[in-house]
Amino acid sequence: MNAKHAPFRHYLDLADARLGSQVVAVSDEWFAPASRMLQAGEPVWKEGVFDDSGKWMDGWETRRKRFEGHDQAVIRLGVPGVLKGVDIDTRFFTGNHPPAASLDGCFCTEGDPDDSTSWSEVLPAVGLQGDSHHYHPIDDERPWTHLRLNIYPDGGIARLRLYGVPYRDWSSLPPGTALDLAAAVNGGRALACSDQHFGRMGNLLNPGRAINMGDGWETGRRRTPGHDWVIVALGHPGSIEAAVVDTLHFKGNYPESCSIQAAFVEGGNEARIEAQSLFWRELLPAQKLEMHQEHRFERHLNALGPITHVRLNIFPDGGVSRLRLFGSPQLP
C-alpha cells in the first residue's frame, strides 16, 4: 500500500513524541536509540557521519543478533487510542533493515506493562523492504495504552507511525468541565483545507505552543480571489466558550483577519461536510489578527449551542500555529 491509498494518514500519529509518547522498554539499541522512531520530523541521511557505535542513523537500530530470538521496543502512547493504520518506515536502512515486523498492544489502567501483562496481536508479522514506507490498515476498535514493535530478527526502523483516534472516557468528566475540544489529544482532527503548501493543517491541533513556523498550518501565497480555510472535527460535541487563534512565529506571513463558522453535523462524509461548510453559522465574526501573537476571543463568540465541526477562515492567506476551542462537552 502506498501513501496515496492510505487514508488513515489523516488521523493523529499517536506515537508522536510531541504527545508525550515514549519508549519504555527496548531489547537492544546498540547503534541508534529507539526514541528516534517517534520523532515528528522526517528521517534524514547524514553522509559520512559516524559516532562511537558506528554509522549514525536516524532511527532505531539494533546490533546483529547472534542467538535465538528477536528485538522489540515497547512504546507508551502519550494518549490512549484506537489504531486506524500504521506505517513502519525503513527509509535509509538498506542492508540493515529487518525482513519482517509485527505489533502487539495492551491497555494498562496504571503504569507500564510487566511480565504478567497480557498482549494482543494488533498487526501480524509483515514483510519489510529497505528504504521504504510500509502502510497497513488496522481494523480493531480496542483502545491501547502501549504498543510493542517486534522486528525479526534485528535491524533498523527509521520511524514508527501509529495513526488513530485518541480514546477518552467522556462520561467520567464532571458536569461543566471545560477543555479544548479541538485538541488532538482530545480527539480533534483536521479534515480538509484549501491549501497546506508550507505547513500541515493537523499541526493546528498539536499540544503546547508551536516550536517554530513549521509546526503550524501555512498556505501558499494566494494569487486569485478568495481566502483560505480549514475544517476541524471536534473530539466531542460541545458548546464553545472561548476560541484561541495563535499566530506565534508568523510575522511577515500571518493572515490579516480570521473568522470561524460552526455546525452540529450528523453523518456524512468529508466531501459532503466540506461542501456544507460554506453555509455554516458564524461562531466568530471576522476579527483582525496580529503577527506572532495569541488571540483569545470570548465576548465576540455567538452562542450556537452544541457543535461538532468548525471552519476556520483566514483572509486572504498565511499561517496560523494553533487553534484552540474551549468548551463544555455535551454529555449524555
Swiss-Prot record:
Organism for this UniProt entry: Pseudomonas aeruginosa (strain UCBPP-PA14)
HAMAP family: Allantoicase (MF_00813)
Pfam families: Allantoicase (PF03561)
Molecular function (Gene Ontology), one example: allantoicase activity
Primary enzyme class: hydrolase
Range of residues in the leader sequence: none
InterPro entries membership: Allantoicase, Allantoicase_dom, Galactose-bd-like_sf
Keyword annotations of the record: Hydrolase, Purine metabolism
Gene3D superfamilies reported for this sequence: Galactose-binding domain-like
GO terms (BP aspect): allantoin catabolic process; purine nucleobase metabolic process
Protein name: Probable allantoicase
Domain of life (superkingdom): Bacteria
